[in-house]
Amino acid sequence: MPPEAPRRGDPSRVLLDHAYLLHRRDYRETSLLLELFTLRHGRIGVIAKGARRGRQGFAAVLQPFVPLLVSWSGRGELANLNHAEAAGIGVRLQHTALFCGFYLNELLMRLLPPHDPCPELFGTYRGGLETLAAGEDLETALRSFELSLLEAIGYGLQLRVEAESGEAIRPERLYSYRIDAGPVPAGDEADAVHGMTLLALRDRRFDTSQTRTEAKRLMRRIIAHHLNGRALKSRELFRSSS
């Protein structure tokens, strides 16, 4: 049965937005609580009433990493999911790539404010899943998504010039990255990274093991700062499985 068309002039009803499921959990006896990342409305929370009994007919497609078309109604923090259908074939993530996918989902839930449309980030997320599924370059997929997410929430990194002098970043120089300002020439800081790593982050190309290692360490510190010390369950799950 096709989804019910929205009533004219009713802003509380949304018809067929592209989406991905970020998280689901059981609610009461028959329903599901869902976190969705949508193309036109950003991250939203919805309730799928009766979905666990199969009354809605779309519970089977509500799986992570499956492109969806969803319709919902209602105002406030929790809307009612009226319709969901697969908009394509979901990517198949295995082993390390699966934990990377969970990591992307958790970052969206923790850092992206609700109801904040980010169509470019949506495209980056979709492309990141495809890269993870292909097993081509997990590190580049993760760093690219982290950078795009920080830009989307207003905390993009300064990766072109030194924060204090305004001079171009030098590949051979060591820098300490100040989260509230940008890169400054480093002294004996333990978290210093080479300028070539900052430029690799700017270009989203990591051609050496050094740039990969330093970029991962720097981004982990910056992400941890914006998480305010909250641990990521996806990382804990990966460690426990290793």
UniProtKB/Swiss-Prot annotation:
Pfam families recorded for this chain?
RecO_C (PF02565), RecO_N (PF11967)
> Which keywords does the record carry?
DNA damage, DNA recombination, DNA repair
Instruction: State the GO CC annotations.
Output: bacterial nucleoid
GO process annotations (BP)? DNA recombination; double-strand break repair
Listed InterPro entries: ARFGAP/RecO, DNA_rep/recomb_RecO_N, NA-bd_OB-fold, RecO, RecO_C
- NCBIfam families, per this entry? reco
| Role description | Involved in DNA repair and RecF pathway recombination.
Cited PANTHER family: DNA REPAIR PROTEIN RECO (PTHR33991:SF1)
The family assignment reads:
Belongs to the RecO family.
* Protein known as: DNA repair protein RecO
